[in-house]
Every structure is written in C-alpha cells, then in structure tokens.
C-alpha cells in the first residue's frame, strides 16, 4: 500500500468511526429529523402536461386539510359521503359516455356489481374478466361513482370488467368489504377459470385486492392470474416513510392526519390495523399471482407500494413496479391524455395479455 493510499484509508477509517459514534446512541434523545422549509420545482423528467399542472397549482395546504377533522367525534361522515357521491356519479356518467362503455348493474350473492363492457373486446379477452375494486379510503366511491377507473380499464384494455360495489362504513366496517369481494369471486369461479380472472384497483381498491388474495389463500381458493395495484393503501398505520416525506407535497392525499387517519379507524372499527386483511403489507405473499404496480415520487403511498413490491420479490413473485416522476397519488387516473396515464393503462393491457390464460 502506497503512502497516499494509507493516508486515504486512515481518513476513511476515521470517518467511519465518527459515524459509528453518532449512531444510534447519540440520537437517543430524538429519533425524528426536522426538515427545513424547501422549494420544489416542477420535476424536469415528468411529462410536459404534468410539469405544467404542477407549476399552475398552489402547494397543498395541510392545515386546511386537517381543519374539518379537529373535532372527529362530531364529524358527519354521512354528509361528506353524500356530497362526494353526487360529484363522483356525475364524473362516472361523463366518462362512461365518452369512452363508449356499456354499464349494467346486477346482484351477485347479495352484492351489488356493475358490469362494464367496452365497445370492442380484445379477441384474447373474449372469455376473460377483470374484477375491479374501487378506491376511496374504504369510505367513498360507492354506487355508480366508483366505476370511473373500471370504465378506463374496460376501454383501454378492451376487457369486460366487473366492479364490486362492496359495503363500507359507517354502516359496514371491516370485514364487510373483504367478505363481499370473496363472495363475488367464489361466484365467478363457478363459471370462469381462475386463470381467466384479473383483480385490482387503485388506492384502497388496490389494498383491498391484496387483502382479498390473502383471504383467497386462507380459504384455499384458486388464485386469479394477474393483479393490478395502483398506489395501494397497504398499511393503514401511520408508519410508512412517504406519509411523512411527501406530506404537503402529494396534491391528492396531502396529509395522513385528518381524512386518511380518520377513515382508517372508521374502516377498521375495533380490529387491529396490522391485521393483514386490513393492512395487507403485513401478510404472507408467498404464492401470489404476478402483480402490476404503479406509484409516483410525490405519492404519499409510495412507501406502501415499495414495501409490498419488496415483500413480493422476497417471496419470489413476479412484480412489475412502475414509478412516475413527480406524480402524486393516482395522478394517472385524472388526466387520461397525459403520457403517465397512457403508459399506465397501455402497459396494464400488455400485462394482462401476458398473464391471463
């Protein structure tokens, strides 16, 4: 070893010794970091549409998002659900019309289900079905208003979609939603091979898809051939890293405290938030079908998505993780003309074509 190399090596050892001295005992008084205020420019690697959208939008106001939930005991969930439903219904009706998707409602095993049929089916999907689970924090998205993304999937993948209008709180907390999905899936298996079924959704719907597969496994059911998890709410505890790092940055969710935190408790009722049927990230992912995953760098559920992906890969499951620069929670579902949206659903179609039998 030369004199110069010995000098560099000695400095490296000294630096490592310093780091060792700093952790972990020197942080015993405070395990939290305080981050200074910072400016975030529109991300250069995002699409022009997304950059423009971010540039023309004010930074999310965390304080305003928390305000309605300061007195959570007196909060009127039913009024908020009714207000959201009216808006969601109008959006769904416009989207279904614009995408030329035919919608019919039916009851399956006592569960309300919407069937969405595209104008033209992909010949490869003639006898295939996508079992869709809507998002909405396990509280919103009931009825017609929950089929918007189902219509997008039907149109872009040219596949028949069954959207499960599962029961939700306040009247029907956990495990009602999981029970409804299992009931519909069992009925579907009577006429459709498991290899011809895909399941999935966005946000709470993605989390519910993962929880449902845990339940399918527990009941020894044949598993679907493919899973779509768009930014899954897979951990309802406030422990995921991006819940903190992307608070006030995610333009959709904004903050966990307030709506998300209250919805988590409302949904779980008295059950443990770490129950894998509530927070599927805590479950066993061995034997899972292939999973197509979407998130963004400004998504508060980025960590949930990453954690599920890591567990899938440790279990040896094929998992296709796609992270879009600058995208907030489920941003791909809001602007269908954006490259982020077109790539998300275009690649989903290819994923379904690859795995549906």
Enumerate the language-model features and the residues they cover.
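N-terminal export leaders
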Residues: 1, 5-10, 18
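N-terminal targeting or regulatory segments adjacent to alpha/beta-hydrolase or S9 domains
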Residues: 11, 16, 24-94
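Alpha/beta-hydrolase superfamily serine-hydrolase fold, recognizing
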Residues: 29, 53-75, 95-357
């Amino acid at each position: 070893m030369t004199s110069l190399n010995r000098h560099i090596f000695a400095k490296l050892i000294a630096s490592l010794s310093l780091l060792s001295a700093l952790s972990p005992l020197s942080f015993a008084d405070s395990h939290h970091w305080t981050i200074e205020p910072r400016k975030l420019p529109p991300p250069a690697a995002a699409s022009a549409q997304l950059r423009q959208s971010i540039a023309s939008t004010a930074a999310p106001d965390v304080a305003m998002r928390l305000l309605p939930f300061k007195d959570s005991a007196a909060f009127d969930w039913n009024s908020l659900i009714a207000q959201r439903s009216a808006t969601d219904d109008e959006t769904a009706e416009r989207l279904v019309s614009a995408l030329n998707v035919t919608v019919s409602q039916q009851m399956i095993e006592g569960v309300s289900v919407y069937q969405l049929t595209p104008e033209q089916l992909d010949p490869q999907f003639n006898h295939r079905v996508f079992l869709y689970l809507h998002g909405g924090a396990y509280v919103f998205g009931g009825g017609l208003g929950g089929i918007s993304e189902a219509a997008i999937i039907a149109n872009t993948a040219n596949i028949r979609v069954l959207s499960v209008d599962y029961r939700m709180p306040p009247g029907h907390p956990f495990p009602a939603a999981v029970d409804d999905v299992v009931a519909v899936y069992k009925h579907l298996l009577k006429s459709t091979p498991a290899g011809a079924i895909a399941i999935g959704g966005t946000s709470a719907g993605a989390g519910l898809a993962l929880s449902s597969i845990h339940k399918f496994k527990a009941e020894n059911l044949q598993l679907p051939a493919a899973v779509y998890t768009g930014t899954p709410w897979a951990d309802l505890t406030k422990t995921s890293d991006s819940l903190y790092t992307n608070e006030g940055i995610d333009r959709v969710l904004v903050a966990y405290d307030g709506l998300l935190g209250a919805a988590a408790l409302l949904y779980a009722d008295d059950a443990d938030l770490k129950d894998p049927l509530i927070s599927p990230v805590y479950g066993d992912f061995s034997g899972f079908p292939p999973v197509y995953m979407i998130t963004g760098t400004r998504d508060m559920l980025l960590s949930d998505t990453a954690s599920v992906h890591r567990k899938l890969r440790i279990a040896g499951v094929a998992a296709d993780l796609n992270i879009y620069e600058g995208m907030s929670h489920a941003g791909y579902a809001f602007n269908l003309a954006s490259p982020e949206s077109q790539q998300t659903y275009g690649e989903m179609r290819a994923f379904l074509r690859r795995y549906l039998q």
